[in-house]
UniProtKB/Swiss-Prot annotation:
TM ranges: none
Chain coiled-coil ranges: none
Function field: Catalyzes the isomerization between 2-isopropylmalate and 3-isopropylmalate, via the formation of 2-isopropylmaleate.
NCBIfam families: leuD, PRK01641.1
Species, as recorded: Shigella flexneri
Record SUPFAM superfamilies: LeuD/IlvD-like (SSF52016)
HAMAP family for this protein: LeuD_type1
Record's protein name: 3-isopropylmalate dehydratase small subunit
Ribosomal protein in keyword set: no
Catalytic activity field: (2R,3S)-3-isopropylmalate = (2S)-2-isopropylmalate
Keywords attached to this entry: Amino-acid biosynthesis, Branched-chain amino acid biosynthesis, Leucine biosynthesis, Lyase
Gene behind this protein: leuD
PANTHER family, alphabetized: 3-ISOPROPYLMALATE DEHYDRATASE SMALL SUBUNIT, 3-ISOPROPYLMALATE DEHYDRATASE SMALL SUBUNIT 2-RELATED-RELATED
Length: 201
Protein backbone atom coordinates (compact mmCIF):
# COMPACT_ATOMS: atom_id res chain seq x y z
CA UNK A 1 0.00 0.00 0.00
CA UNK A 2 1.27 3.47 -0.89
CA UNK A 3 1.50 6.42 1.47
CA UNK A 4 -1.82 8.16 2.05
CA UNK A 5 -2.18 11.72 0.79
CA UNK A 6 -4.74 13.83 2.62
CA UNK A 7 -3.04 17.15 3.39
CA UNK A 8 0.41 18.50 2.69
CA UNK A 9 2.19 21.70 3.65
CA UNK A 10 5.38 22.36 1.77
CA UNK A 11 7.93 24.79 0.43
CA UNK A 12 7.13 25.94 -3.11
CA UNK A 13 9.64 26.25 -5.95
CA UNK A 14 8.62 28.17 -9.10
CA UNK A 15 9.66 26.53 -12.39
CA UNK A 16 8.61 29.28 -14.78
CA UNK A 17 8.57 27.23 -17.98
CA UNK A 18 5.80 25.89 -20.20
CA UNK A 19 5.80 22.57 -22.07
CA UNK A 20 8.28 20.90 -19.72
CA UNK A 21 8.62 17.47 -21.30
CA UNK A 22 9.46 14.13 -19.74
CA UNK A 23 12.93 14.11 -21.29
CA UNK A 24 13.70 17.33 -19.42
CA UNK A 25 12.24 15.86 -16.22
CA UNK A 26 14.34 12.68 -16.47
CA UNK A 27 16.64 12.32 -19.51
CA UNK A 28 16.55 9.02 -21.39
CA UNK A 29 20.08 7.94 -20.41
CA UNK A 30 18.86 7.42 -16.83
CA UNK A 31 15.95 5.11 -17.64
CA UNK A 32 17.72 1.75 -17.40
CA UNK A 33 16.33 0.90 -13.96
CA UNK A 34 12.83 -0.44 -13.36
CA UNK A 35 12.69 0.29 -9.63
CA UNK A 36 11.20 3.58 -8.50
CA UNK A 37 14.12 4.83 -6.43
CA UNK A 38 17.30 6.64 -7.37
CA UNK A 39 15.86 8.87 -10.08
CA UNK A 40 15.68 12.01 -7.95
CA UNK A 41 19.42 12.52 -8.33
CA UNK A 42 18.87 12.97 -12.07
CA UNK A 43 15.71 15.09 -11.96
CA UNK A 44 16.02 17.93 -14.50
CA UNK A 45 19.59 16.71 -14.98
CA UNK A 46 20.37 18.78 -18.07
CA UNK A 47 19.10 21.93 -16.37
CA UNK A 48 20.38 21.32 -12.84
CA UNK A 49 23.95 20.51 -13.83
CA UNK A 50 26.59 21.99 -16.11
CA UNK A 51 28.35 18.66 -16.71
CA UNK A 52 27.11 15.31 -18.01
CA UNK A 53 28.01 13.45 -14.80
CA UNK A 54 25.80 15.69 -12.66
CA UNK A 55 28.60 16.88 -10.39
CA UNK A 56 28.64 20.60 -11.19
CA UNK A 57 25.37 22.32 -10.19
CA UNK A 58 24.04 25.06 -12.44
CA UNK A 59 23.77 28.11 -10.16
CA UNK A 60 21.21 29.71 -12.48
CA UNK A 61 18.67 26.88 -12.24
CA UNK A 62 15.89 27.51 -9.74
CA UNK A 63 16.07 24.12 -8.00
CA UNK A 64 19.65 24.93 -7.03
CA UNK A 65 18.78 28.24 -5.34
CA UNK A 66 19.40 28.03 -1.58
CA UNK A 67 15.93 29.36 -0.70
CA UNK A 68 14.26 26.45 -2.48
CA UNK A 69 16.20 23.57 -0.99
CA UNK A 70 13.80 21.00 0.41
CA UNK A 71 10.89 22.13 -1.76
CA UNK A 72 8.04 19.63 -2.00
CA UNK A 73 5.60 21.62 -4.15
CA UNK A 74 6.51 22.42 -7.75
CA UNK A 75 4.78 25.36 -9.43
CA UNK A 76 4.91 25.15 -13.22
CA UNK A 77 3.31 26.41 -16.41
CA UNK A 78 0.97 24.78 -18.92
CA UNK A 79 1.36 21.35 -20.53
CA UNK A 80 3.67 20.01 -17.84
CA UNK A 81 4.89 16.46 -18.47
CA UNK A 82 4.42 16.45 -22.23
CA UNK A 83 6.54 14.39 -24.63
CA UNK A 84 7.21 10.68 -24.53
CA UNK A 85 5.36 8.44 -22.11
CA UNK A 86 7.60 7.40 -19.22
CA UNK A 87 6.51 6.61 -15.69
CA UNK A 88 10.05 7.47 -14.64
CA UNK A 89 9.03 11.16 -14.72
CA UNK A 90 6.78 11.02 -11.64
CA UNK A 91 9.24 8.55 -10.10
CA UNK A 92 12.00 11.17 -10.40
CA UNK A 93 9.81 13.94 -9.00
CA UNK A 94 8.69 11.93 -5.98
CA UNK A 95 12.15 10.51 -5.35
CA UNK A 96 13.51 14.08 -5.27
CA UNK A 97 10.88 14.94 -2.67
CA UNK A 98 7.99 16.50 -4.54
CA UNK A 99 4.48 15.71 -3.35
CA UNK A 100 2.50 18.19 -5.46
CA UNK A 101 2.81 19.80 -8.89
CA UNK A 102 0.61 22.83 -9.60
CA UNK A 103 0.10 23.91 -13.22
CA UNK A 104 -2.66 25.11 -15.57
CA UNK A 105 -2.55 21.83 -17.51
CA UNK A 106 -0.73 18.51 -17.73
CA UNK A 107 -0.07 16.00 -20.48
CA UNK A 108 -2.70 13.26 -20.15
CA UNK A 109 -0.34 10.31 -19.66
CA UNK A 110 1.81 12.16 -17.13
CA UNK A 111 -1.35 13.22 -15.29
CA UNK A 112 -2.50 9.62 -14.92
CA UNK A 113 0.95 8.34 -14.01
CA UNK A 114 1.20 10.94 -11.26
CA UNK A 115 -1.83 9.58 -9.42
CA UNK A 116 -0.45 6.06 -9.76
CA UNK A 117 2.66 7.22 -7.90
CA UNK A 118 1.09 9.40 -5.17
CA UNK A 119 2.17 12.64 -6.84
CA UNK A 120 -0.74 15.10 -6.76
CA UNK A 121 -1.15 17.11 -9.99
CA UNK A 122 -3.25 20.20 -9.24
CA UNK A 123 -4.84 22.09 -12.12
CA UNK A 124 -5.57 25.77 -11.61
CA UNK A 125 -6.44 28.43 -14.16
CA UNK A 126 -3.77 30.41 -15.99
CA UNK A 127 -4.74 33.52 -14.04
CA UNK A 128 -4.51 31.68 -10.71
CA UNK A 129 -1.12 30.22 -11.59
CA UNK A 130 0.06 33.71 -12.59
CA UNK A 131 -0.99 34.93 -9.13
CA UNK A 132 0.89 32.11 -7.45
CA UNK A 133 4.07 32.77 -9.42
CA UNK A 134 3.92 36.43 -8.40
CA UNK A 135 3.32 35.43 -4.78
CA UNK A 136 6.21 32.94 -4.67
CA UNK A 137 8.64 35.30 -6.39
CA UNK A 138 7.73 38.08 -3.96
CA UNK A 139 8.00 35.73 -0.98
CA UNK A 140 10.83 33.22 -1.52
CA UNK A 141 10.48 30.41 0.97
CA UNK A 142 6.69 30.59 1.15
CA UNK A 143 4.79 27.42 1.98
CA UNK A 144 1.43 26.35 0.55
CA UNK A 145 -1.17 24.17 2.27
CA UNK A 146 -2.67 21.58 -0.08
CA UNK A 147 -5.80 19.82 1.16
CA UNK A 148 -6.89 16.96 -1.08
CA UNK A 149 -9.95 16.20 1.02
CA UNK A 150 -11.24 19.77 0.69
CA UNK A 151 -9.66 20.16 -2.77
CA UNK A 152 -8.06 23.47 -1.83
CA UNK A 153 -4.69 25.18 -2.01
CA UNK A 154 -4.10 27.86 0.63
CA UNK A 155 -1.44 30.33 -0.44
CA UNK A 156 -0.87 33.53 1.45
CA UNK A 157 -4.24 35.09 2.19
CA UNK A 158 -6.10 33.29 -0.60
CA UNK A 159 -7.62 29.88 -1.10
CA UNK A 160 -7.74 28.25 -4.54
CA UNK A 161 -10.17 25.48 -5.38
CA UNK A 162 -9.28 22.53 -7.60
CA UNK A 163 -11.13 19.39 -8.68
CA UNK A 164 -9.89 15.81 -8.72
CA UNK A 165 -11.84 12.86 -10.09
CA UNK A 166 -13.59 11.13 -7.17
CA UNK A 167 -12.01 7.73 -7.80
CA UNK A 168 -8.46 9.10 -8.04
CA UNK A 169 -9.05 11.23 -4.97
CA UNK A 170 -10.25 8.16 -3.05
CA UNK A 171 -7.19 6.17 -4.11
CA UNK A 172 -4.71 8.87 -3.10
CA UNK A 173 -6.38 9.54 0.23
CA UNK A 174 -6.33 5.83 1.05
CA UNK A 175 -2.87 5.09 -0.35
CA UNK A 176 -4.21 2.72 -2.99
CA UNK A 177 -2.26 2.01 -6.16
CA UNK A 178 -3.39 -0.61 -8.71
CA UNK A 179 -1.94 -3.41 -6.56
CA UNK A 180 -3.61 -2.08 -3.44
CA UNK A 181 -6.94 -1.88 -5.24
CA UNK A 182 -6.60 -5.50 -6.34
CA UNK A 183 -5.70 -6.66 -2.83
CA UNK A 184 -8.93 -5.14 -1.52
CA UNK A 185 -10.68 -7.96 -3.38
CA UNK A 186 -8.24 -10.68 -2.34
CA UNK A 187 -10.90 -12.83 -0.66
CA UNK A 188 -13.23 -12.64 -3.66
CA UNK A 189 -10.39 -13.51 -6.03
CA UNK A 190 -9.34 -16.48 -3.89
CA UNK A 191 -12.95 -17.68 -3.71
CA UNK A 192 -13.34 -17.45 -7.48
CA UNK A 193 -10.08 -19.29 -8.11
CA UNK A 194 -11.04 -22.05 -5.68
CA UNK A 195 -14.19 -22.72 -7.69
CA UNK A 196 -12.35 -23.11 -10.97
CA UNK A 197 -11.56 -26.66 -12.17
CA UNK A 198 -7.96 -27.76 -11.83
CA UNK A 199 -6.34 -28.78 -15.10
CA UNK A 200 -3.63 -31.38 -15.28
CA UNK A 201 -0.78 -31.24 -17.76
Amino acid sequence: MAEKFIKHTGLVVPLDAANVDTDAIIPKQFLQKVTRTGFGAHLFNDWRFLDEKGQQPNPDFVLNFPQYQGASILLARENFGCGSSREHAPWALTDYGFKVVIAPSFADIFYGNSFNNQLLPVKLSDAEVDELFALVKANPGIHFDVDLEAQEVKAGEKTYRFTIDAFRRHCMMNGLDSIGLTLQHDDAIASYEAKQPAFMN
